[in-house]
Amino acid sequence: MPSIVGKRRGKHTYYYLVESARVDGKPRIVSQEYLGSAEEVMAKLAGASTVEPVRSQHKRFGDLAAVWSMLDRLGLVAIVDSVAPRRADAGASVGTYIALAAANRVVAPCSKLAFADWWATTAGSRWVKTPAGSLDHRRFWDAMDHLDTEALRQVETELGRRMVTEFGLDLSGLVLDMTNFATYIDSTNDRAPIAQRGKAKQKRMDLRLVGLALVVTRDGGVPVLSHAYPGDRPDVSQFAMVIDELVTRYRQVSESLESLTVVYDAGQNSHDNHAVVEETGLGFVGSLPPSDHPDLLAVPRTDYLPVDADRYPGLTCVDTTLTALGVTRRAVLTHSPTLHAAQSRGFDQTLAKARRRLAELQARLARGKTRRDRAAVEAAIAAILKPRWVGEVLTATLTGEDPTELRLTWRTDHNARKRLEDRLFGKRILFTNRTEWPAADVVAAYRSQSEVEAGFRQQKDPHVVSFGPMHHWTDQKIRVHVFYSVLALTVAHLMRRQAERAGLHMSVRELLTELAGIGETVLLYHDGGKGRPRARRMLTDTTPTQQRLADLFNIHRYAPTR
């Protein structure tokens, strides 16, 4: 039964509401809530307050508490600390620093230099106790120095196990893809060979790149394996290494590879890469460039059958076998009216742009004012006709030799346009060794690539769950940065998956925005005497959706008690 007890502090007595129970046969206080001084208790009973607050603060709470709850369920701090023991002079353990970095990546990405100021705006210091000065950016760097490549691999492997046991994650279907991220590392820095100039997918050709291979589950798009590599290396060159590591990891959590199916796109295709997949015995679903298989494309549309009218209205297919990449395997040629229409619209826009450029060049040559020789004009025409399929439909003829005599004529071959559309538009060739699957399941597996693509887009969002900003300039620290950035994506997608299963269908950003709306208000009181102001904390009002999320992620355990 609850009771009120007083505790003497100097000349003053402060009162608490306590509840006792027997623990191991002995009476113990199991809960305690501060009520205040005698005057404050009397004022509360009278429905008044002895003093008004002198000021207030607003702290970030909901999103950070939910993320920390997920990190706690994963056991991140303990896992990291098991491979990177804490130094005696460190303000916090290595695991704590990595958890703090990952949480920051999820809710409000910033540099380590700005971290302490950001942390002060949150309620996190109530449940993560760190000494003053321990959140300095140099302390983060010290912690990162304790995690080499092997330690990161061990941590990632153990986290994979925890995701299966704690969240029931289904690893039978995995999707592999690769991308790269631009960095702002100085060109003269020779301590980060992993950052190289290459084909930037963010179109920043002026910046050095870090490549990232990611394997995510079809069950929620949750990352289970990442691999950072130099940004100047083609994606296809990293495929075998990622598959080998994936097989090693999977065998640590499952006795057999027979249930595992890996999905990847045609960009990873090569005879050597496919030989690796065949040797491992993995199930796979990939794709082949349709234009490489004209005989299959020539199958008449009357031979196509519906894939699944309920799941994929309008989608039809031809289910056959095909020899490619050195093997003969099942091939599912699909035709999608939606893709067909989109490709047709896109190609019409490309054609219109090419026609406009040809007309401009034609008019310029007709005026006889060009100074370019014939070879230069031919190169300009070739550049205009270079986009995919344009050269099949537009025909350009250049006459004359002298620059002032050069003339251009061009025409659109509408019959060629029609043949092109009938042959290619709307078609995909899926390549798989899952012969027992219905065609609809093969299509579903291939389309699950959207999960990893969504993850890459999320990591390029500068506001939440972002890869950047990255202010590191050595290989080792870049790899640690990649690790906790991928971990942030893992946590965010686990949260989205958990919300989805609870009937809350929202994107990562929508989810975090709802949680961020749960704030903590701090009221500061001072009676005019000596000493620091007394703080009273409370959470802001919540909407029904916010309340459901608060319950779902159990953030109440981090809520203030007084």
What are these model-derived regions, one by one?
Residues 3-6, 12-16, 24-28, 54, ...:
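Anion-binding and metal-coordination hotspots
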Residues 47-93:
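Accessory, often N-terminal, substrate/partner-engagement and coupling regions
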Residues 1-60:
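Low-complexity, Ser/Thr/Pro-rich intrinsically disordered linker/stalk segments at domain junctions
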